[in-house]
Amino acid sequence: NCDEANKTSTLRSNIYNLFILLDSEMRRNFPSILQNKEKDRGRMLFGKFMTLLVKNCHEVREVAYYADRLCITKDYLYKICNKVEHRTPKEIIDNIVANEIKQYLSDTELSIKDIARTFNFEDSSYLARFFRRMTGMSPLDYRGR
């Protein structure tokens, strides 16, 4: 039994070493293939980020939430967004939320307070501050134009 455990351990170790050797050979001999694969993965993750964002932007505006849902770190999400969009994840989130709020202001009769509640702001003053920072105007001014 002990001899079999040693054989299994040795086999695992050899397989692990083989994978390390293959990885280093691939990186040395085919760097462009690996770079393209990383680009494709980044684009795929960015697409998933955008899908999650559109579904959840009414409730959640934190970068960590989206990174967790994608099973990546906030730093890696930042790197992906920067490569694909040349913007941070927070800038993308805020931009999507601001555009959604614009839609609500244009297409509904909901009060600012109700829109703030819909987008999970503490109260209407937080929404107004956010909206002014993003657009340069108050929600009421935007609605009235």
Residue ranges of model-derived segments:
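Charge-rich, low-complexity intrinsically disordered segments
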Residues: 60-90, 95
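All-alpha amphipathic helical-bundle segments outside canonical DNA-binding/catalytic cores
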Residues: 2-14
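Basic, amphipathic alpha-helical hairpins
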Residues: 1-5, 21-31, 48-62, 81, ...
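Residues within helix-turn-helix
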Residues: 64, 75, 111-114, 124-125, ...
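Short hydrophobic/aromatic patch on the recognition helix
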Residues: 77-78, 126-127, 131
